Amino acid sequence: RHTLLSWLPEDMRGLRLLDAGCGTGALAQEAMRRGAEVLAIDLSPTLVNLARDRHAQDLLTDPTLSAKGGSITFLAGDMLSAEHGEFDHVVCMDSLIHYDTQTIANAVEALTQRTRKSVLFTFAPHSPLLAVAHAMGRLFPRSDRSPQLAPIRKTTLHVYIERAVREHGWRPGHMQRVSSGFYTSQAWEWKRT
């Protein structure tokens, strides 16, 4: 979360941000603290309700959350729906890690069509260790395992995304590996030029 937030403006007053796959709402709250108007969306109504409840409590105890006039609207639903309108920035933290290369590229393309400045996302980078773990995970019955990570080769993903969005003025920006304990992801920024 800290890496993706570091790629966003410190002052987000007057900017609209989509937190696509908001989970518990931690990133949405930090964007609000910077003054952003945030739409925090997740497929899980349970997570959205948890995020909404935590946010209500945090507003009571942390006056810095609303000091710059930001706001958060929490919603359970499809992050790719055009009904949500346009945004200045979009963040998809760990919401695309279960998808294959083409599906990620399609999602990024759909989001860039409604975004003015940047789309930030994470994906599960291909590595020999993850490839072995992924193969071993397929040995277990589907009902006994958690959602499957899709290890992605960043060079292939780059080709797919660039092919989809380059003609609309989008270019790759920052890229950083994020590791903490067993967690590893690749964070990537695409910017409109």
Outline where the language-model segments fall.
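Conserved alpha-helix/loop element of class I SAM-dependent methyltransferases that forms part
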Residues: 1-13
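Class I SAM-dependent methyltransferase SAM/SAH-binding core
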Residues: 18, 26-65, 69-78
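Conserved glycine-rich SAM-binding loop
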Residues: 23
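Short conserved loop adjoining the S-adenosyl-L-methionine
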Residues: 81-85
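A conserved beta-strand element that flanks and buttresses the S-adenosyl-L-methionine
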Residues: 91
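A short, conserved alpha-helix within the catalytic core of class I
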Residues: 99-110
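Conserved beta-strand signature within the Rossmann-like core of class I S-adenosyl-L-methionine
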Residues: 116-124
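Short alpha-helix
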Residues: 148-166
